[in-house]
Amino acid sequence: AFTVANHVKNSTATIIVQCTADSALPELDTVTDGKLDNNADWDGTTVPKDYDFCFAWETDTQYYAEEWQNHFLNINNWIVNNAEERKIKYVIHTGDIVDDVDMTYEWENADEAMGILDKAGMSYGVLGGNHDVAAGLADYENYYKYFGENRFKSQNTYGESYKNNKGHYDLISEGGQDFIIVYMSWNIYQEEIDWMN
C-alpha cells in the first residue's frame, strides 16, 4: 500500500505524475477531486484474479536516469516485488532510457535500475529511443555498451539480435498463447524493415 510516510524526506514529498491529455500534450492541471479525467473507462482487467498473466511496460525513463534515479529504482523494485501477485511475466521498455546520449552517469543510472530486473531473473527487452541515440546522429555507442546483445542473450526469451540489439525479438509463451515481441530502435530504414519482415 502507498503510504505518505515512506515518501517524505525533510518534511517534503516529491511526487512525479506522468499523464497525457487528449491533445497528447502533458496534463498540468491540479487534481483536486481525487481523479484524473482521461476519458478512459476502467474495465477491471487490472485485478489479478481477472487475468492469467500480464506484461509490465516502461517507457521514457530518461528524466529518471537524468535526475530522479530513486524513481527509476522504485519502478523496477515494484515490478520485481509485485511480479508474483500481479502475474507479471515480462517487461517491455520502449525507449528513451536516458535523456542525454553522452552523459555517462545517466547510462550508469539506467544500468543500475534495469539491473534490478537482471538480478531478479525477470525477462525484459529494450529499444533505443531518440534520446538514447542522439536522434538523427544515430550514436549507438553507449546504447550498445549498456544495452547491447550481451546483456540479454542469456535470457530464455531472447530470440535473435539485429546489429547488437539495435533490434531484436523475444519469444514468450504464457497462458497457452505465444508472443513475438519485436523491438527496433530509432533511425530505421529499409534494411531494418527487411530484418523485421
What are these regions (language model features)?
Residues F2-N10, T20-D22, W42-D43:
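Short, compositionally biased P/S/T/A/G/V-rich stretches that sit at domain boundaries
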Residues H7, D60-Q62, N130-H131:
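Histidine-centered active-site/metal-ligand motif
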Residues H7-N10, D29, R86, A120, ...:
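Glycine-centered loop/turn motifs
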Residues I15-V17:
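C-terminal edge beta-strand
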Residues T20-A21, D194-N197:
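Short, intrinsically disordered, charge-balanced linker/junction segments flanking boundaries
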Residues D22-Y105, N187:
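N-terminal active-site segment of His-dependent metallophosphoesterases
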Residues G34-D37, M103-D194:
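Extended active-site neighborhood of metal-dependent phosphoesterases/phosphodiesterases
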Residues N74-N82, E112-I116, W195:
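A generic secondary-structure signal
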